[in-house]
């Protein structure tokens, strides 16, 4: 995944997380409670984001079309979201559990393409 597009997607999802709820989640004193609270915010942000799944592969909206994303890139996105939230160092060891939960969220967001629309490099043709 291109670096610029990755940063844009990271900022999109983080923008849906930040705020008072994230600040409150980071104030939790116990690591497990803090990770669970941030994980819940991450789930909600992914549900509202452009990330979805088609034929078993994650996709995201790049501004023009939905583009394919490797599962490894999705895993890196989850880790980088945790870093961007400024979670304490000990919390990163729980990233695999958070990733597992977030993958389930994406699995529930199936992309349904419209075969009546054809996308070209310079335009979109709607056959309806």
State each model region's role:
Residues 2-128:
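Intein modules and their embedded homing endonuclease domains
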């Amino acid at each position: 995944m291109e670096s610029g597009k990755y940063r844009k997607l990271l900022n999109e999802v983080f923008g849906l997380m930040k705020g008072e709820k994230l600040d409150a989640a980071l104030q939790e004193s116990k690591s497990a409670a803090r990770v669970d609270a941030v994980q819940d915010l991450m789930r909600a942000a992914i549900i509202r984001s452009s990330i979805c799944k088609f034929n078993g592969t994650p996709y995201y909206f790049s501004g023009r079309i939905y583009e394919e994303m490797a599962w490894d890139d999705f895993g890196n996105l989850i880790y980088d979201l945790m870093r961007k939230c400024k979670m304490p160092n000990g919390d990163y060891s729980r990233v695999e559990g958070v990733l597992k939960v977030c993958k389930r969220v994406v699995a529930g967001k199936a992309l349904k393409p419209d075969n009546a629309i054809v996308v070209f490099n310079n335009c979109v043709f709607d056959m309806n």
